[in-house]
Amino acid sequence: MIRRPQSSTGRARSGLQQGEEYKNWLADFAPIFKELLEPRGSIVMEVGNAWEPGAPVMSPLALESLLEFLKKGDFKLCEQFVCYNKATLPGPTQWVNVERIRVKNAYTHVWWMSPSSHPWASNKRVLTPYSKAMLELLKKRKYNPGERHSEHVIGQESFFKDNKGAIPSNVIEFTNTRSRDKYLDYCREHHLKVHPARMAMNVATFFVKFLTTPGKLVLDPFAGSNVTGAAAEQLKRRWVSIEPQEDYIASSKGRFPRPGRAQKLK
């Protein structure tokens, strides 16, 4: 299950009471989603950062909401990720652009949770290309073994095995700066509303590959423009996406190139 719930930082959501309402709203889904998961299934949740209204102070609402969801569902926190958007616009405007007393906020929290301590996962499915230095090392089979300043001890042959790629970190980089893609072109052509807070495709693709195998079912209960469904479709996973706003459902058809498939999204 991959989910990006409605933002905790929405302009209409300012003040403690509304923040508490958001936290409780999110946490109430935890036991419901737990019933839908297989015992070794996973939930991946992305939540943006929040600022206190009228002050250059960050709110702990995002972390509090994740903690409350974790607690109410009795989930295990398998790993925390950071999604870093290196091309994000500066903001909040007053504190970053006008008064210049803060730096731009360029990341979101992503928590991977599961009812199990050992959910289905394999980092072999999400390996990244080796660096030029690593490729040279594999070719020359020569490096300096021994103890490092970090107290790690590197063996004589520790880096000689070719694993076909490097293990990725828990920091995922992406940009959402493209002015043209199939989804945006489809929205323009059919005069449809573009979703304003689309999940990055490579984020959804990473977790679908990491946590599932072909044929498994992926659910996104807050689908928006259905990035998760499109990623699952490309990776030959079954998928179900839920979205209450019909205009976003209509625009999501642009993510699916086959006309026959798109007709099923109603």
Task: Show the residue positions of the predicted features.
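S-adenosyl-L-methionine
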Residues: 257-266
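Core catalytic lobe of class I
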Residues: 1-251, 257-258
